Amino acid sequence: MPPANPHLNHTGGCTKTEEEEAASSEEDSGSFHGSGVCKWFNVRMGFGFLSMTHREGICLDSPVDVFVHQSKLHMEGFRSLKEGEAVEFTFKRSSKGLESLQVTGPGGAPCVGSEKKPKGTQKRRSKGDRCFNCGGPNHHAKECQLPPQPKKCHFCQSISHMVANCPIKAQQLSPGSQGKSTTSTGEEEDMSHTPLLPESTD
């Protein structure tokens, strides 16, 4: 009875295990070298595909797709690839297809990468790149070429006061909010006094 179980479940565990063993032995047997260009790369998701034109130095008849994940890119900072960027890489054959192991620029140089950055990263960086001394872009206050500037109001840019005491900001806020509340309060007071007068006279 125990020997019959593997044969009954032939399409289940046994075959799958043999395929996995074959795939893992293929992966262990080594990696291959290829070169080509980046076909596409999603900077937000961090993966894409390479279009391999040469394998082990031999030109291929037609390009072959090789999966690439950002963790395999040889470069500093934010890792990404630019569409059409020339690359060299090592790759392996897996159950999912061809997957890159390490990706570099030509001659082992670092990858160039895409100018595109995920939207969240762009917003954070643009705020961080403003100088709080002069207000200029692309540098920080500690790197500013100008001497320390006087503190100024963030609302009207005047150096005579801070934003908390800004008269222009106070003027813009007061007509809308305070004017309406004063008028409605005044009307309520007038209306509350008006009904009392006729009742007291009668």
From Swiss-Prot:
Chain sites annotated for binding Zn(2+) 1: 131, 134, 139, 144
Modification Phosphoserine occurs at: 174
One Pfam family named in its UniProt record: Lin-28A-like_zf-CCHC_2
UniProt keyword Transferase present: no
GO BP annotation list: chordate embryonic development; negative regulation of gene expression; positive regulation of cytoplasmic translation; pre-miRNA processing; regeneration; stem cell population maintenance
UniProt domain CSD: residue ranges: 33-106
PANTHER family: PROTEIN LIN-28 (PTHR46109), PROTEIN LIN-28 HOMOLOG A (PTHR46109:SF2)
Assembly mode: Monomer.
Function of the protein: RNA-binding protein that inhibits processing of pre-let-7 miRNAs and regulates translation of mRNAs that control developmental timing, pluripotency and metabolism. Seems to recognize a common structural G-quartet (G4) feature in its miRNA and mRNA targets. 'Translational enhancer' that drives specific mRNAs to polysomes and increases the efficiency of protein synthesis. Its association with the translational machinery and target mRNAs results in an increased number of initiation events per molecule of mRNA and, indirectly, in mRNA stabilization.
UniProt similarity note: Belongs to the lin-28 family.
Protein name, entry field: Protein lin-28 homolog A
Species assigned in the record: Danio rerio (Zebrafish)
